[in-house]
């Protein structure tokens, strides 16, 4: 057999697939069982959620970064097949990670919980898989639960998604039921990769990570051609060239190989120093004989949510910078730049894909780098059109220009899809209306579940919307959103003043109709949280020059009349006047300490105005 025939023969036995599911439907457990069944790992190495390697992932039980692994499986027809399993995150913030990993596959196993049925993110991920023309194999998981209703769920898969679920595998990943049927279905139904091993190299980067010794390690799926050590390669998006040092596959552990050819999923190292050079979704080609065009699907990720991160101990500013640099190496979607605040000192303005992404980065900084952080209120990006025709992009409320010069402000809107049990439709619609949502569509999925679609401003979803949605449906709702563009809104910037001074870190942008209520609530909250001083402190909420709400923290005062028993009124008055004069002088020079809870109070605006 020639080299080409060998490669083509091997190619016909490759199956690339990923597992997609809603959070908690048992995706990582199924991956564990498949690894066990194909004996990729010994019993000794087996631990729960084997592919979730980050501590945080194991702790929260979610998948954040994607992982891939090569498995060998001897099928019933006697052939040995090579499987590449690519594990994907299920959370809405990491949709791009899902779409990239799906682009590296030919098939997807759709895991649906036999008790819960289809959820919003199941749908979102299925649509991504269909966009990538993948063969979808439905698997109904957790059939050993007492509340499982596999037949109802099978019907739901057919009705809601439109997939033929007549031969869906009934399985329980935890108990190890049905795993072999799943593997046999992969062999039969998932197509082998197409592509010419002799053509110019085309490989998709679907992830990258930074290794202190080898530089950047790119995770790739070879679509055409062959790549081997010593070859010169070129990145098509950035145009940078490198020489390949090592290629290999994961059998969860990295294992060097002689070459990677069509259909292989593995890793590649070349002396790449900067993660920015291996953009996820980019195409690698040969520098000598480059491919004519790149693979589709690459796009630069733009952050959706911004917030300020400040070290509580200002001496740790440089440590925070190093922490962000290291995290950025592994996370191409994190963006940051230095900023200063009069109230909080030096820190960074960081951009994230969404709220979960933001929480995870904060937690990793506090945990892995031991830096205590203060975070400011998250905000989205506003487009501000000025009266002189200029357009300004504002990601920090304190940069909002003077209201007199603004013609209009546009904010990002999202299309939010919620899957809700029937009984809670009213509560959810009320919540969405209160968040300035516009009703778009409502469909009954079956007798007791409804899908509701709203258009809403991203700014309203950013903070605590998901928590409120969960609490108004007793935890049963699921939720997914996609950006649909910018729309004009009546937005104003509200400043909070303490003792007549603006506190920049407490400024926020709010819709004009809600400004008065929002201002009133915050002023009252701050009054409770800021400790009393020796002089009285007015707290004011202002829009431009206009004060919309005010509250006063009363001064602590000593009883100066204690030693005047009875006594003449003029004597008492003299002592009181003297005390008053002292307080007045103090008020001119005194400054107010704002505790961290006060910043958090502005964020936790859960009592949003009811319409």
Curated annotation (Swiss-Prot):
It is found in: Cell membrane. It is a peripheral membrane protein. One of its GO terms (molecular function) is GTPase activity. CDD domains: EF4_II, EF4_III, LepA, lepA_C. One of its GO terms (cellular component) is plasma membrane. Keywords: Cell membrane, GTP-binding, Hydrolase, Membrane, Nucleotide-binding, Protein biosynthesis. GO terms for biological process: positive regulation of translation. The keyword tRNA processing does not apply. Coiled coil: none annotated. Its EC number is 3.6.5.n1. GTP binds at residues 24-29, 141-144. It catalyses: GTP + H2O = GDP + phosphate + H(+). It comes from the Bacteria. Pfam families: EFG_C, GTP_EFTU, GTP_EFTU_D2, LepA_C. HAMAP family: LepA. Required for accurate and efficient protein synthesis under certain stress conditions. May act as a fidelity factor of the translation reaction, by catalyzing a one-codon backward translocation of tRNAs on improperly translocated ribosomes. Back-translocation proceeds from a post-translocation (POST) complex to a pre-translocation (PRE) complex, thus giving elongation factor G a second chance to translocate the tRNAs correctly. Binds to ribosomes in a GTP-dependent manner. Belongs to the TRAFAC class translation factor GTPase superfamily. Classic translation factor GTPase family. LepA subfamily. This is Elongation factor 4.
């Amino acid at each position: 057999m020639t080299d080409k025939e060998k490669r083509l023969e091997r190619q016909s036995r490759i199956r690339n697939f990923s597992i997609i599911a809603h959070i908690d439907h048992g995706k990582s457990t199924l991956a564990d069982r498949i690894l066990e069944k194909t004996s990729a790992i010994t019993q000794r190495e087996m631990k729960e959620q084997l592919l979730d390697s980050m501590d945080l992932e194991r702790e929260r039980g979610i998948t954040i970064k994607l992982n891939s692994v090569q498995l060998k499986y001897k099928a019933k027809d006697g052939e040995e097949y090579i499987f590449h399993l690519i594990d994907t995150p299920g959370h809405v913030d990491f949709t791009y990670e899902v779409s990239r990993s799906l682009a590296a596959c030919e098939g997807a196993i759709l895991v649906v919980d036999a008790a819960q049925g289809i959820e919003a993110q199941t749908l979102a991920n299925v649509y991504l898989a269909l966009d990538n023309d993948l063969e979808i194999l439905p698997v109904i998981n957790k059939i050993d639960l007492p509340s499982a209703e596999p037949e109802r769920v099978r019907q739901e898969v057919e009705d809601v998604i439109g997939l033929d679920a007549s031969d869906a595998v009934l399985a329980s990943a935890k108990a190890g039921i049905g795993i072999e049927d799943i593997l046999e279905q992969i062999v039969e139904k998932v197509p082998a990769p197409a592509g010419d091993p002799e053509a110019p190299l085309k490989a998709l980067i679907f992830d990258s990570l930074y290794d202190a010794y080898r530089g950047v390690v790119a995770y790739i799926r070879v679509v055409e051609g062959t790549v081997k050590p010593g070859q010169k390669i070129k990145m098509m998006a950035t145009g940078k060239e490198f020489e390949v040092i090592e290629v290999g596959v994961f059998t969860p552990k990295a294992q060097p190989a002689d070459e990677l050819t069509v259909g292989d999923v593995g890793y590649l190292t070349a002396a790449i120093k900067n993660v920015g050079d291996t953009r996820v979704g980019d195409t690698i080609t040969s520098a000598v004989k480059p491919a004519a065009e790149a693979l589709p699907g690459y796009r630069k990720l733009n952050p959706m949510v911004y917030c300020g991160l400040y070290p509580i101990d200002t001496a740790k500013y440089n440590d925070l910078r190093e922490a962000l640099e290291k995290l950025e190496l592994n996370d191409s979607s994190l963006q940051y730049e230095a900023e200063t605040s009069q109230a909080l000192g030096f820190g960074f303005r960081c951009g994230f894909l969404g709220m979960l992404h933001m929480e995870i980065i904060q937690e990793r900084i506090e945990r892995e780098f031991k830096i205590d952080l203060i975070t400011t209120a998250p905000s989205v990006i506003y487009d501000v059109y000025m009266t002189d025709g200029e357009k300004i992009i504002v990601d920090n409320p304190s940069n909002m220009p003077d209201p007199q010069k603004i013609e209009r402000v546009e904010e990002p809107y999202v299309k939010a899809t919620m899957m809700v049990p029937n009984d809670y439709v009213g509560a959810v619609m009320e919540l969405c209306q209160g968040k300035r949502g516009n009703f778009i569509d409502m469909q009954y999925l079956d007798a007791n579940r409804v899908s509701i679609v709203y258009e809403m401003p991203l700014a309203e979803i950013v903070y605590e919307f998901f928590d409120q949605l969960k609490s108004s449906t007793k935890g049963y709702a699921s939720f997914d959103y996609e950006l649909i563009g910018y729309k004009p809104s009546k937005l104003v910037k509200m400043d909070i003043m303490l003792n007549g001074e603006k506190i920049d870190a407490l400024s926020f942008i709010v819709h004009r109709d809600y400004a008065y209520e929002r201002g009133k609530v915050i002023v009252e909250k701050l009054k409770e949280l800021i400790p009393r001083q020796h002089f009285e402190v007015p707290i004011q909420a202002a829009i431009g020059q206009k004060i919309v709400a005010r509250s006063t923290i009363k001064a602590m005062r000593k009883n100066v009349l204690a030693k005047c028993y009875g006594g003449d009124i003029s004597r008492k008055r003299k002592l009181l006047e003297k005390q008053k004069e002292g307080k007045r002088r103090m008020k001119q020079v005194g400054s107010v300490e704002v505790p961290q809870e006060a910043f958090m109070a502005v964020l936790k605006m859960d009592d949003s105005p009811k319409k």
